[in-house]
Structures are given as C-alpha cells and as structure tokens.
Amino acid sequence: MENKIFSGDSFFTAAGNVDTMSTEPLSVVFLGGSLTSGDIDYEGTSLTDWNMKWPNTVLRFLNGLFPSREITAHNAGLGGTGSQYGAMRFAKDVLAYSPDLIFIEFSVNDMPNIHHERSVNREGCLWRQKFLENIIRQAMNCEKVPAIVYVHLPVPALIGSERNLAHRLSCEFKEDMLRYYDIGTIDVYDVILNEFECRKKMDSSLTLQEFLKQYYHMYDSGVFDVHPHAWGYKLFNLAVVNALMKEPQKYLRPFKMRKDIYCKGEDEIVNRTFNYIKCGDERIKYTGDWKIYTAENKLVTDNSFLAIPDGKYTNNNDFPDGIAQVYMPKDEASFEFDTEADAVCFPHVSSKLGLGSTIYADGEKVGEFTCFSNYQGMNYSGDEIKLPKGKKHVKVKINNPTETATVFRYGYVVEIFDK
C-alpha cells in the first residue's frame, strides 16, 4: 500500500482547492456501452457531431479545470458493454492507458430482464454487482490507483413501469457497493426528472411521456429507444458536467482501498482475471475458409452482411486487433486452441443467419451459443463456457444447417481465470 500512487490526490491542493497550476499529464478513460461511445442515435446512425458525446463534453470541462495539464483521453465505450463484459475489457481497454481518472457507465446494459419476477431481477443485479466489484479490485491492484466516477445514464420510461423499476433496481444495487468504496456517482435520471418538474410548472398539462418524446424516439408500442435524439445527448452532457462543476471534490478523489470485498463469499468472480487471445494469434488453429481482417486489411461489407472487396461499410472499427471471418456455403467450420483457463467467453460474434456454435474440451461437449445477427453482431447470452480444470484442448465448431451461404465472425477469445 505504501508504494502506491493515488491519482485522485493530484487534483486538489492541500488547502482543498482545485490545483490549476499542476503540469502533470492526466490520462482519462471512459468505459461504457453505446451511450458512452456515442456510436448510434435512436435511428442506429452514427453521432458525427463531436459535441454530442458526453465524454467529449467532460473532456472539455477537464481541460478548463486543469489548464496547465496535458490531458489525453480514450473513449472505451463499446455497444452492449455492461459490468460483466466491462470486467473482461478492463485491463485491455482501460488499464492499458495508465489512467488517472475513469468514468464508468453500465446502468442501461446492466438492467435486468423486465419480464422476470422482482426476486429474479434481484439475483441478476447481484450477479452484475460482482463484476463491477471486480473492476474496482482491478483498479485497486494498480501501482497507480485511478480515481473512479460512476455515471448512471437513464432508461426512458414512465415512473413505476416495469422498465423503470428494473433500471432503478440496477442503479440501487450499484449505489450500495459504490458507497462502500466511497466512489462518487452521477445519476442523470434525477436530472431528467428535475427538468420535467421545472417544465411542468410552466405547463401543468405536460405528461412525462410527452416530455420524454422531446428527447427520445417512442415506438408504436409506447416504449422509448434508450438511444436519445441529439437533445437527449445534450441533456446527458449538461447533467454530468454540472455535477462535476458543482462539487468536483465529491468525484475527483481517491476511493477507499477496502481490504474486505463487498460481495461476501464471491471471491471467485470478484478476484478473477482475464486474458484476451486475438483471432490472429498463433495459438489458434483454423479449419475452413477463414480470413483475418485488420486495420491495414479492413473488412468491408455491404448490406447483405457478406464481405466484399470494396464498399462503404466497415464492421471492424471496434476490433483494432482484427476480425476472423469464415465464409460458409452450408458446411461447418471450426477454430481450436489449448488453454488452462477455468472458462472462456466469445463476447463479440456475428452471423447473418444466427448460426449455432458448439464448444468441446478434449473432445467432450462443454457448451454452446447462438450468434445474434444484429448490425454489430454481439452475443451476450450464456457468455461464459465453463471448462475442466487443468490444461485442455478447446474446439469451437460452427454449424450452418441451412441451404443459404453465410459468414461467421469473431474478434477475440477471452480466457477467464478464477481465484
């Protein structure tokens, strides 16, 4: 503990004032899902306006707060990232940048299934809580311990609705643990409600639904898309920056280095570690018509989701280390590797037809997953595949039982080591 450096100590003087004279470089990382990356609005299109992304607005604020510090920022937002995948990504996509300050946003993607009973939702929240604590413990183990700010971005829903209750439950479970570590939190949902109350004073007939429609797209079903209009993103920006501006000491400071974990009896998950195997790593052997695409050899696709030599759309922006793709007329393909991991995960896979994959360890079936076929091709259901103890040979077999030719893609294998 004596040898650790706490980045949060560098933000203020001994008198408690913002240290505007410090010239120390400042590294800031933002970790979250699509609302952090700013990749899409409600229509699924790219947010091209730099000012719309809340991390960029925060960065602009920090540059004003610390005018003498050279600030570098990395946006590690990636669509669909919640606490589980965030824990897997933390070392590779956050700690690799030696951050002094980290902003985390998972509350939307961590929202439990609204169709489950509340008791089941509680179990889901507890499960995600363990991975968020894993992230905090990873940060604690750094020689330079970063400051952390947690941001609750909202799910637009009517108060008391199933969707609203599920989201608030997710936030409540996080708040309990974040208080244990004395990590500051910013709740944008509260800001939205305050804005609604202010508007209602001017127009007593205004309903919450009509108010939300000014910021979000509402479908015919009455459900709002979680990706807002441009004005919704601006509301995020104002909420986060105003909180930081009002009480910087509340957020820009070290968190408590707790010896005991919060999630009692869950040491296996809270203290686990992760390793990424890139799809182009020599450890992985392929069977089938596979190709590896990198930043220099980009995967370009058309709307048919099949790879073409030239085109307008690129799908590997999220995979700077490469994408492996196999063209499958109707037969099977596979990739295999040796590992001593306790489990493996394939967090981002895609196929146009929703192909099924079966995982074997030393010839015995240990799990399977189905690839979703949305535009980013993400798979988060049944992520972790438990493996036998010790060294084993893992084979992933992809099946195409249809008569239609298609492709399968993936970016990484994540090795999971329990402690």
Feature locations, PLM:
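The substrate-binding groove and active-site-proximal loops of carbohydrate-active enzymes
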Residues: 79, 117-127, 159-165
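Active-site segments of SGNH/GDSL-like serine hydrolases
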Residues: 109, 136-172
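Structural recognition of the beta-strand scaffold that forms the well-ordered cores
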Residues: 27-31, 72-77, 101-106, 147-152, ...
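Conserved catalytic region of serine esterases and O-acyltransferases that act on ester linkages
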Residues: 2-7, 209-419
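Extracellular serine-dependent O-acyl
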Residues: 4-13, 147-152, 168-219, 234-248
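Serine-esterase "nucleophile elbow" of acetyl-processing enzymes
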Residues: 2-76, 91-98, 343-348, 352, ...
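Oxyanion-hole/transition-state-stabilizing segment in secreted/luminal serine hydrolases
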Residues: 29-30, 37-44, 83-126
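Alpha-helical scaffolding within the catalytic cores
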Residues: 11-17, 56, 84-96, 120-123, ...
